[in-house]
């Protein structure tokens, strides 16, 4: 039992694995025996049906073949055992099962092939006798096989139970002994630690070679080291008392210097407080300026948007005026065409008057016969005169309309020029506002930089104040320590 903890745990694991393997193998073998018993019942039933079928007057060959195949399942299951299982059966004195199974497999194979080769029309008494002879041996020995199966099942179950119980008992005994050995070593370590806690560093023991023994050796070495350390501390204590006097003088001098530095630190803290207040005021003013600049920038942006809207409206109006100018030009062209048509009508009227005059002259020459023609000529001349008067009126109206169109074109041209001037002025104003917005943005950026710098300076000053306060507290602590050292050395 004088082995390491690792060896003990490995031994426990090996025994547990072996116990599990034995139990698993036994359960498998018992399952095989139960399977063989089931196939044996199938075997007996199938052979009985074959035997009774052969004694009938009308024999069904396909039924016999099916039952023989059913009976062969038992022999096939036995013959498919592992070599280890077969060796175990022979070791237990049950090799007869394997021999009976092999012989029955041969007989049933011959019977199946023989029955499959017989056709119904060719069946004769000789075939029946041959099949009876082939089935008689498996049928006769099936009882022996069943007895052997039942016996081996009982024997395997008993052996498995015995092995499992024995191995588990041995397993628990080994665990108990290992725990007892390990616990005694741990109790010894606890005893050594208790003695060391009471100041006894002289305990000695003979450690073992396992992990617990190594722990004991380490604890003993630690006790020796602690003992040597205590002796060294005793020697150092004397040197400390000698150095204490020198430390007293140094501490008194340091205390005086610290008192002087404390006054200067107070003045420095006061100056830093004033600087911090001024930086805070600057930061607040920068923030207010940033807010005002932001409002001014927003107003400028709104004004720029309004100007852009006005420019868009003026451009739309200018486009409409241009469209009207084009439409009036088209009207002017149409009026010119009308004037040409009126000129043609004047020419036609003049020709008509001339023709009417010639007709009247010819009617006068004709006398009475030309009176009716003279009346028509007068009417034609009258119509030509009215047409001529109408053309004069139309020409007067066209002249008046041309004057109005000329005036409208002039006004529209002025409107276009004015709208372009307005657009240019608005664009110039928009560019100016855009420059203002850019300038305000730069101002806001500079103000933000000023505010950021002020905040950073404020943070730096705050850190300096904190550090100064810490230095002051340290100085006060050092002064207090110097006084205590002086008091300790005075009482010593």
Swiss-Prot record:
| Gene3D superfamilies in the cross-refs | Methyl-accepting chemotaxis protein
Compartment(s) of residence: Membrane
Which pathway, metabolic or otherwise, does it act in?
A: Hydrocarbon metabolism; alkane degradation
Q: Show where the Methyl-accepting transducer domain sits.
A: 236-472
* SUPFAM superfamilies the UniProt entry points to: Methyl-accepting chemotaxis protein (MCP) signaling domain
This protein's major location comes to membrane
Cross-referenced PROSITE patterns, in alphabetical order?
Answer: CHEMOTAXIS_TRANSDUC_2, HAMP
**Protein name, per record:** Putative methyl-accepting chemotaxis AlkN
Species of origin = Ectopseudomonas oleovorans (Pseudomonas oleovorans)
């Amino acid at each position: 039992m004088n082995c390491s903890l690792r060896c003990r745990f490995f031994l426990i694991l090996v025994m547990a694995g072996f116990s599990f393997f034995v139990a698993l193998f036994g359960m498998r073998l018992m399952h095989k025996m139960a399977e063989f018993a089931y196939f044996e019942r199938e075997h007996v039933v199938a052979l009985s049906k074959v035997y009774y079928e052969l004694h009938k007057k009308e024999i069904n060959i396909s039924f016999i073949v099916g039952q023989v195949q059913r009976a062969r399942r038992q022999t096939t299951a036995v013959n498919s055992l592992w070599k280890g299982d077969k060796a175990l059966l022979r070791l237990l004195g049950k090799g007869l099962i394997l021999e009976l199974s092999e012989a029955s497999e041969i007989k049933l194979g011959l019977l199946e092939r023989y029955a499959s080769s017989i056709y119904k029309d060719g069946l004769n008494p000789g075939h029946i006798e041959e099949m009876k002879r082939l089935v008689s041996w498996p049928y006769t020995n099936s009882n022996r096989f069943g007895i052997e199966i039942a016996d081996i099942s009982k024997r395997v179950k008993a052996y498995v139970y015995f092995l499992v119980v024995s191995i588990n008992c041995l397993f628990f005994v080994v665990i108990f002994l290992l725990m007892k050995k390990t616990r005694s070593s741990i109790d010894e370590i606890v005893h050594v630690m208790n003695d060391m806690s009471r100041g006894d560093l002289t305990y000695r023991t003979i450690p073992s070679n396992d992990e617990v023994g190594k722990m004991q050796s380490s604890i003993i070495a630690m006790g020796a080291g602690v003992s040597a350390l205590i002796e060294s501390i005793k020697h150092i204590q004397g040197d400390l008392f000698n150095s204490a006097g020198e430390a007293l003088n140094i501490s008194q001098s340091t205390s005086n210097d610290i008192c002087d530095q404390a006054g200067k630190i107070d003045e420095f803290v006061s100056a830093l407080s004033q600087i911090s207040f001024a930086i805070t005021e600057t930061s607040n003013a920068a923030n207010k300026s940033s807010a005002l600049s932001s409002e001014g920038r927003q107003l400028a942006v709104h004004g720029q948007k309004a100007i852009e809207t006005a420019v868009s409206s003026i451009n739309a109006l200018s486009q409409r005026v241009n469209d009207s100018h084009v439409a009036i030009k088209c009207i002017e062209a149409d009026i010119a065409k009308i004037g040409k048509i009126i000129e043609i009508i004047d020419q036609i009227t003049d020709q008509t008057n001339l023709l009417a005059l010639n007709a009247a002259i010819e009617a006068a020459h004709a006398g009475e016969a030309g009176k009716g023609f003279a009346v028509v000529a007068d009417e034609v001349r009258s119509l030509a005169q009215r047409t001529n008067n109408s053309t004069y009126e139309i020409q007067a109206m066209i002249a008046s309309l041309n004057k109005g169109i000329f005036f409208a074109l002039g006004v529209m041209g002025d409107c276009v020029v004015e709208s372009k001037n307005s657009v240019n002025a608005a664009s110039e104003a928009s560019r100016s506002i855009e420059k203002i917005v850019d300038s305000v943005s730069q101002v806001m950026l500079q103000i933000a930089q000023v505010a950021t710098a002020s905040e950073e300076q404020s943070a730096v000053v705050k850190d300096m104040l904190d550090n100064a306060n810490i230095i002051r507290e340290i100085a006060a602590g050092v002064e207090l320590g110097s006084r205590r050292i002086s008091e300790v050395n005075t009482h010593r």
